[in-house]
Amino acid sequence: RTCPYAQRARLIIAAKGISADLVNVDLNKKPDHFFDLNPYGEVPVVLHNGGHVYESLIAAEYLEEAFPDPPLFAKEALVRANERIYFNHATK
């Protein structure tokens, strides 16, 4: 079973065609070093350019900003808001 929060990151990585190594973490047996990446021990954690980002929505925004092409959302504000609503429902 995949965590819905980690699924957000996976969906964005797939939609944007980002080359990534996906690592599954056993949420019942998290390795100690995982807490160095996220003090809360939650997924996802995105490692990129020597840094790391956690919290699923912040990670999603980071991936959109770090990999702008292709854009994940439309340019028009109302269309973009509706896309985010759909995305939010799809990843709950």
Curated annotation (Swiss-Prot):
InterPro entries in alphabetical order: Glutathione_S-Trfase_N, GST_Omega/HSP26, Thioredoxin-like_sf
Positions annotated to bind glutathione: 30, 43, 55-56
Family annotation (Gene3D superfamilies): Glutaredoxin (3.40.30.10)
Induction record: By treatment with KCl and serotonin.
Domain GST N-terminal: 1-71
Catalysis: reaction(s): RX + glutathione = an S-substituted glutathione + a halide anion + H(+); L-dehydroascorbate + 2 glutathione = glutathione disulfide + L-ascorbate; methylarsonate + 2 glutathione + H(+) = methylarsonous acid + glutathione disulfide + H2O
Keywords from the named record: Oxidoreductase, Transferase
Gene Ontology terms for molecular function: glutathione dehydrogenase (ascorbate) activity; glutathione transferase activity; methylarsonate reductase activity
EC nos: 2.5.1.18, 1.8.5.1, 1.20.4.2
GO cellular component: cytoplasm
Pfam family, one: GST_N_2
Active-site residues from the entry: 3 (nucleophile)
Function noted in UniProt: Exhibits glutathione-dependent thiol transferase activity. Has dehydroascorbate reductase activity and may contribute to the recycling of ascorbic acid. Participates in the biotransformation of inorganic arsenic and reduces monomethylarsonic acid (MMA).
Family statement: Belongs to the GST superfamily. Omega family.
Entries under PANTHER family matching the protein: GLUTATHIONE S-TRANSFERASE OMEGA, PTHR43968
Protein name according to UniProt: Probable glutathione transferase
Species, as recorded: Aplysia californica
